[in-house]
A protein has these predicted regions:
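Conserved alpha-helical scaffold segments that buttress catalytic/binding sites
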Residues: 2-297
Length: 297
């Protein structure tokens, strides 16, 4: 079924929330939007090109006050990204925002909070509920769900005094691996959040989980966060944390298609794909195919 929405692509090539892969290198997720464009994202989605929100320069050190890497830059970038997303929503577009790492969620959530209360469907291989006190990297990309729901330094949780950007009771977390191979990611979604781990998809089936998600948001407009590390590395290894297990592309498509075809879904972001880890661009083709099938077929 083709989308009757006005789709808009807004690139958010920020790597500010990740640790450097080496002392003299930056994370390669910043190349994701360009590579997806090279593989036909705009034409396949029949979307309007709304340009790029350029991030501040990446700094390798961790902010001493917040214990978050690039904290001030993420704060400033969130303001810029929120402005651009807000304008697209005001004009009636369905924004599709390729990152970038998961810290771009702060700008998205700020844009939504300025407009009222929205839900968040958080599809991710990890819960991203770390804090500066238990994160070994200081990367906001592992803290983003905690930050947008009000836990963490006020510089990032209370931009414009709007904390929390998303109420915990309005969040559904889907696809996270548990037990988590990353022993640092000890936090599980707790009530009032809704938690649907990878095992729920595997035991109940993607159709059941997709229907449950749509039911969860039947009375609340929501945004879709999609971190492609939710996929099994057999299909998507070009991520910073390619842990064992994960969804199949078919199961993920079933859930994403159901979510974005809901009239309650107002937009989505895609994060963490790193083209520098994917020389044959298999991951890029998978992402473009998935989005095209979910939104246009």
């Amino acid at each position: 079924m083709r989308s009757h929405r006005r789709l808009a692509i807004l690139d958010a090539p920020s790597n500010l929330g990740l640790k450097p892969p080496a002392p003299d290198r930056e994370p390669g997720v910043r190349y994701m939007p360009n590579v997806l464009r090279e593989h036909g994202l705009l034409t396949r989605l029949r979307a309007e090109d709304c340009g790029t929100v350029v991030p501040p320069p990446y700094v390798h050190s961790i902010d001493s006050e917040t214990k978050v890497r690039n904290a001030r830059a993420i704060h400033d970038y969130s303001l810029a990204l929120a402005g651009s997303i807000g304008r697209l929503l005001y004009r009636g577009f369905f924004p599709i925002v390729p990152g970038g790492d998961c810290s771009i969620l702060l700008g998205v959530a700020l844009a939504l909070r300025r407009r009222g209360n929205f839900g968040l469907l958080f599809i991710d291989g990890h819960t991203d509920l770390l804090t500066p006190d238990n994160s070994e990297t200081g990367g906001a990309a592992g803290m983003d769900l905690a930050l947008v729901t009000g836990t963490g330094p006020r510089l990032l949780t209370s931009i414009e005094g709007l904390a929390p950007f998303v109420k915990p009771e309005d969040v559904a977390v889907l696809g996270y691996r548990w037990p988590d191979p990353d022993s640092r990611s000890i936090a599980l979604p707790a009530e009032p959040m809704t938690g649907l781990p990878l095992g729920s998809v595997q035991s109940n089936g993607a159709d059941y989980v997709a229907a449950k998600v749509v039911k969860r948001f039947e009375s609340l407009s929501f945004w879709l966060h999609l971190d492609v590390d939710v996929l099994n590395p057999a299909w998507m290894s070009a991520v910073d944390s390619p842990d064992p297990g994960g969804m199949t592309p078919d199961d993920l498509l079933t859930i994403v298609r159901s979510a974005v075809q809901s009239s309650r879904c107002v937009g989505m972001e895609i994060t963490i794909y790193d083209p520098t880890l994917d020389p044959d661009r298999q991951g890029a083709r998978l992402i473009v195919d998935l989005l095209s099938k979910a939104l246009q077929e």
